[in-house]
Structure formats: C-alpha cells, structure tokens
Amino acid sequence: TEFTAMAKNKTQATDASVDAYIAQRASDEQRADCTVLMAMLESVTQHKPTMWGPSIVGYGSYRYTYESGRSGDMCLAGFAIRGRELVVYLAAEGEEQQALLSRLGKHKMGKAWLYFKRLADLDQTVLGQLVAGSVAELKRRHPAQNGA
C-alpha cells in the first residue's frame, strides 16, 4: 500500500505578529532581551523575523529531508519565550559548539534548544557565534535548499 498523505509539520511559518507574541508572552526583562535577540538573529541570518507556529520567532528557512523520506521546512535560527526562560534554536551543532558553550555563561542545552533566564547571564558575542555556527552547519547540510 502506498502512503501518500504525509503528516503535516506543526511548526510552519505563519503571518502572526512577532511583536504581538512578544507583548503577550514576555516579562519586561524578557522584552528587552527579545529586542537584543531579534537584532542579533537578524544580523546573523540576514532575514527578518517571522512567527513559526504559535511560539517560535524564526529567521530564514531551510528545507530538510529525512532518510525516511519525510521532509519539511524550518527556520534557520530562532527563539521562543518558555515561561521564565528564553530559548534559542540551535538546530545544528557547528564545529566550535562545545568549546563555545563552555564559555557562554549560565544556560542549559537541550537537543536543539539553548535555555537561559536572561541575556545578562551570557556572553552575547559567544551566543552570536553559536547561532552563526548552527546556521552555517544547516546550510552546509542542506546546500540545495538552504533558504539563502
């Protein structure tokens, strides 16, 4: 039997307002940090912010295809507000990631998300290098459709 109806990815680019999302979800301190993150991610990716799903502020996009054949689109870089924490999307581990993480400051790293409470706890130059490394690695892995 042929399975033609692929499951649709939940996280897709939308027309929702980035500013409205931040206004609704962020504390005052988080709002200031979001402003800095937005400038950093726009500078690194050379893309304007777009909402991806209901809760990710994403920049740029790339198309991926798994060995299973499932494919989709995702932002090259992004961030989200998760309660009292901010998270930055680092989809791909660049060559320098482990060394950079050791110099970053107070954070937790998940599979593809970097969690922290405030930018003041982090070395922002290192954070920018982490994002740039992840974006470069995504473009290297997906050269035919890197969203550039």
For each predicted feature, which ranges?
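Charge-dense, helix-prone N-terminal extensions
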Residues: T1-A148
